[in-house]
Design a protein with these regions (language model features):
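Contiguous, well-ordered alpha-helical segments that form the cores/surfaces of helical PPI scaffolds
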Residues: 9, 19-20, 38-46
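N-terminal active-site wall of soluble small-molecule enzyme domains
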Residues: 16-29, 43
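A short, charged/proline- and glycine-enriched loop
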Residues: 2-9
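Acidic/Gly/His-enriched mid-domain segments of enzyme catalytic cores or analogous surface patches
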Residues: 42-133
Length: 133
């Protein structure tokens, strides 16, 4: 598996219950492996809670507003291939690790076919070059 941990997985989104969640995470930080959605990321950082992973899927420019604060280098970005490129660039400049995923957008399916099946060497080079997972 990608992550080896005995911790409880906490997937944190921006919800009406987020204040209660923040209290629990602050009281027992060692208990949780935290995956934050992009919409909860800044809020967690404001409370000095550093997620191990932050996930972003949306390619719209407004999504980059969820990443205005300094990015902790230890936080791994899990990004869809259609995610906003400004977010990817910010994590690359920060020398943070990045893992890409495909949520099924039709254009990404074409990209998968071309890149993974026909040009696997290009994909491996891109991962090595940019310190991605």
């Amino acid at each position: 598996s990608l992550f080896h941990t005995d911790k409880t997985l906490a997937i944190i989104g921006a919800s009406p219950n987020l204040d209660n969640t923040i209290s629990e995470l602050k009281e027992n930080p060692e208990k949780y492996f935290i995956i934050a959605t992009d919409t909860s990321f800044q809020i967690l950082l404001q409370h000095k809670i550093i997620p191990q992973v932050v996930a972003t899927l949306d390619g719209q420019v407004i999504s980059s507003r969820h990443f205005l604060q300094k990015i902790p280098r230890s936080t791994i970005l899990l990004a869809d291939f259609c995610a906003n490129p400004n977010i990817i660039e910010k994590f690359l400049k920060n020398k943070s690790k990045i893992a890409f995923t495909n949520t099924g957008h039709p254009l990404v399916s074409l990209f998968d076919l071309w890149l993974f099946q026909k040009n696997n060497k290009i994909w491996n080079w891109a991962i090595d070059r940019h310190n991605c997972l």
